């Protein structure tokens, strides 16, 4: 069975593909309306959909979150995990209700997040993180992540790559890769090239989720 793609996903707001990436933005608009975020095309929607646990190195994000929130960003989180991290993100959402949304962790909501989001925050290369990275990339969401077999660090000179890889396990290395991604996000043509590199869209197997 091939991986479900946004071209054939009935759970998202608007289907889209590599060739129709402009329709991805319609998902962002609808998601922001449904989950209380202030939509702005110029502001990237970041997402985090893997379990909020120590194993997934959430401390690296916790250490740098204030620096991230000083940027023009929005954040969608599926808030399931250890109590410490659930409380951390719940408090952030209370402080920034129009910028941060805690979303119920189910498959339909996750796929809406993938369809709406621009950047995926991956704090580890555990199997459960890599599983979410792969799904998100298939929806044109660009990961900030440690090096792993799924990704190639973006090279702007060659216009190659599908992720922004941080090479040191430190908050500042993570933050530098995020800033690099956000700078590229300002250039729609370049960003679309990265998205198309990330997306896998089998043309010969059209699957539709009718659930």
Q: Where is each model-derived feature located?
A:
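Catalytic cores of carbohydrate-active enzymes across secretory and cytosolic contexts
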Residues: 1-211
């Amino acid at each position: 069975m091939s991986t479900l793609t946004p071209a054939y996903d009935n759970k998202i707001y608007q289907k889209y593909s590599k060739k129709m990436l402009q329709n991805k933005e319609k998902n962002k608009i609808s998601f922001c309306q449904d989950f209380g975020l202030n939509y702005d095309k110029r502001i990237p929607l970041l997402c985090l959909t893997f379990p909020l646990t120590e194993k997934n190195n959430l401390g690296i994000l916790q250490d740098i979150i204030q620096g991230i929130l000083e940027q023009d960003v929005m954040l969608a989180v599926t808030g399931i995990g250890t109590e410490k991290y659930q409380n951390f993100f719940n408090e952030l959402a209370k402080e920034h209700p129009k910028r941060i949304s805690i979303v119920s962790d189910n498959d339909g909501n996750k796929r809406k997040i993938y369809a709406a989001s621009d950047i995926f925050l991956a704090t580890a290369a555990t199997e459960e993180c890599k599983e979410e990275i792969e799904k998100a990339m298939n929806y044109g969401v660009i990961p900030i992540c440690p090096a792993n077999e799924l990704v190639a660090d973006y090279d702007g000179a060659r216009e190659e790559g599908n992720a922004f890889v941080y090479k040191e396990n430190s908050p500042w290395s993570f933050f530098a890769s995020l800033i690099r991604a956000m700078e590229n996000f300002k250039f729609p043509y370049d960003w679309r090239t990265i998205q198309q590199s990330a997306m896998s869209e089998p043309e010969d197997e059209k699957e539709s989720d009718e659930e």
